[in-house]
């Protein structure tokens, strides 16, 4: 891969097209080459179009990302914009992990919803009619376990705990819906137990309403 990249750069192209150049490599080498490609691109100042299905590659390498579905552009923006402010449900679900919570709009002006009768605040007005059925999108890293003043709270039971190294992913059963909660791993962390009753918390600004 390094030789192929060197050959492409030898002719001093105005635009460099890379079509999934790291897909056949193992994880560690892929991360190393990803950083190397980014360093070379910035050093030489060559406009680069990088095609990938790897979301982490797209977020870490890009100045701007184009998210496409079925040949149509879903959204164009910086990695920060694409991840934190997705404009479509497809973009939100495609980039990173995402929880989708079925809710009913209670008060569009104040951004209040309900989930199985429990109030959920979004912190901003909602463009939908009272009583409309929507979904609340929340990233797993925005969720926590336990009570937190001023946050939304949903009661559930732990269905699974998966250790992923830097994070611990907890799958919480809310009845007919599951939430993934990502906890930052630290040596003093007490791992939750399967079947343990828990309360999931998240701040109103961490979620947004979608179809």
Residue ranges and their predicted role:
Residues 34, 47, 85, 106, ...:
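Hydrophobic alpha-helical segments and their boundary regions
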Residues 70, 106-107:
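Short acidic/glycine-rich beta-turn/loop cap or linker motifs at sensory/regulatory domain boundaries
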Residues 94:
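Nucleotide-binding/hydrolysis machinery
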């Amino acid at each position: 891969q390094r030789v192929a990249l060197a050959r492409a750069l030898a002719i001093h192209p105005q635009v460099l097209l890379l079509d999934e150049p790291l897909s056949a490599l193992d994880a560690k080498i892929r991360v190393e080459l990803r950083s190397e490609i980014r360093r070379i691109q910035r050093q030489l100042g060559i406009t680069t179009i990088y095609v990938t299905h790897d979301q982490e590659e797209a977020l870490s390498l890009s100045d701007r990302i184009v998210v496409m579905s079925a040949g149509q552009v879903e959204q164009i923006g910086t990695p920060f914009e694409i991840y934190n402010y997705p404009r479509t449900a497809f973009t939100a679900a495609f980039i990173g992990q995402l929880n989708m919570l079925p809710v009913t709009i209670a008060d569009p002006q104040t951004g209040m919803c309900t989930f199985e009768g429990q109030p959920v605040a979004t912190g901003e007005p909602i463009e939908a009619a009272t009583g409309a059925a929507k979904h609340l999108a929340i990233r797993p890293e925005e969720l926590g376990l336990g009570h937190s003043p001023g946050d939304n709270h949903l009661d559930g039971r732990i269905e699974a705990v998966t250790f992923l190294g830097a994070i611990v992913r907890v799958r919480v059963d809310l009845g007919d819906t599951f939430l993934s909660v990502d906890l930052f791993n630290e040596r003093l962390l007490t791992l939750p137990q399967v079947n343990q009753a828990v309360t999931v918390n998240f701040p109103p600004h961490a979620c947004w309403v979608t179809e």
